[in-house]
Structure formats: structure tokens, C-alpha cells
Amino acid sequence: MVSFSSILLACSAAIGALATPIEPLADHPNEAFNETAFNDLVGRSTPSSTGYNNGYYYSFWTDGGGDVTYTNGNGGSYSVQWSNVGNFVGGKGWNPGSSRAITYSGSFNPSGNGYLAVYGWTTDPLIEYYIVESYGTYNPGSGGTYKGQVTSDGGTYNIYTSVRTNAPSIIGTATFTQFWSVRTSKRVGGTVTTGNHFNAWAKYGLTLGTHNYQIVATEGYQSSGSSAITVY
């Protein structure tokens, strides 16, 4: 894909996360199986999961590449450390999502490709959306169609849309639309009034459906870094 959004979520429909198939060991009959090395490799990363922690919904998904550790903290806090990952996304928030003002604080330090965003899904229609507060070396808007701008919470966001065809989603492999608001001046911390973005998207014909989950997410793609975020 052009951006990270291929990340998303279908490791199983139940947890709303994607999975990338792993090449079976049987395809390499001449390679000796080292169980200790294999267990060390798998054990480096936190497994994909979803659920509730200290009153907040959380979602964490990884394709298993590289080393990524996701840790739920007190209240709405979580942290992620990653090194030479394939792809992951995780964070805390709510299920279902809604048009709410989300306040968050913390740190976000990607080395390479990474996003810090309010992230969520809707169904009927199936939409994957990002309100991007900060990013690393790749501006996700560069892969979409520019629609306009919205001014909210002391900043200007460029609005983009893109279509994913036969891609993983919260309901399995599907074709769906992505909505993006990308802040022109990066920040880590503040309030995101999601309703302002939802209304602006609707103005440009980008209509959300019934909300599924909504989190303040850290995402990494073929990169390293660290993040520590608290959602209020």
C-alpha cells in the first residue's frame, strides 16, 4: 500500500486486527529447525490483542516482524517501544467511538515511518479513519486525494481520501475507503475535537457509518522508535 493503513486489523475479525501469513517452515526442508532461536524470535514482540484496561478500550496488532513491546499503563496510558518492525498499531480509547473531544499527552519518537493519530473504524459504510497529529518520515497525505482543509484545536489539517481494494479490515478482506485529516504543524499533546473533523469530512462528501472502536494510536512501519501516550 502507499501508506500504513494496510496495517489494519484483521488478524481475526474478532479482535479487529490483520495478519500477514508466515512462510511455513515446511517450505524449507533443508533448513534445520532451531527451536530455541525460534522461541527467542517470537518472544520479542507483544502478541496482538484487544480488550479493556483500567476503564479504556485498547487494541494492539502486530504483523510479528521485528521487536515491538506494547504495555498498558495506569488509566488511559500506554507505551510502545519498537525496533526494525514490520508493521504494528496500538493504543487506548473507546469502543464504540463517537464524536467526542479527546485530550491526550505524552511523547512520540519515531525513527522512520510512524504515525500518532486518533484512529478508528466505522461500518455501513466500512471506513477506516485517521486524524494524524504527528508522523515520522512519511506524510500519509501524499498517498491520497486531497479534498480540502479543516481548522480545529489551534491547527490546520489537510483532508484526504483513498480507497483500499481487497485489503484486511475489521470485517476481513474487503474494499473500503480511508478518511484522513493530517495536521500541517505536528504536535504531541492537546485536544482533538473529532466532531470538527467528522463534520468537515461530511462537507466533502465523506460520510462515516456506525462507529466501531476509536483509539489514540501509535503506528510503526519498517521503523524503530518509542511512544508513551496518555488518553483522558
Curated annotation (Swiss-Prot):
Catalytic activity: Endohydrolysis of (1->4)-beta-D-xylosidic linkages in xylans
Signal peptide feature range: 1-19
GO cellular component, as recorded: extracellular region
Cysteines engaged in disulfide bonds, as pairs: none
Glycosylation sites: N34
Example of a GO MF term: endo-1,4-beta-xylanase activity
pH dependence: Optimum pH is 6.0. Retains over 95 percent activity in the pH range from 5.0 to 7.0, and 70 percent activity in the pH range from 4.0 to 8.0.
Active-site residues, as the UniProt record annotates them: E128 (nucleophile), E219 (proton donor)
Gene3D superfamilies listed in its UniProt record: 2.60.120.180
Domain of life of the source: Eukaryota
GO biological process: xylan catabolic process
Activity under varying temperature: Optimum temperature is 58 degrees Celsius. Has complete stability at 60 degrees Celsius.
Residues in GH11 domain copies: 44-232
Cellular compartment(s): Secreted
Keyword Oxidoreductase set for record: no
Family according to the record: Belongs to the glycosyl hydrolase 11 (cellulase G) family.
Role this protein plays: Endo-1,4-beta-xylanase involved in the hydrolysis of xylan, a major structural heterogeneous polysaccharide found in plant biomass representing the second most abundant polysaccharide in the biosphere, after cellulose.
Protein's name in the database: Endo-1,4-beta-xylanase A
Source organism of the structure: Aspergillus oryzae (strain ATCC 42149 / RIB 40) (Yellow koji mold)
Gene label: xlnA
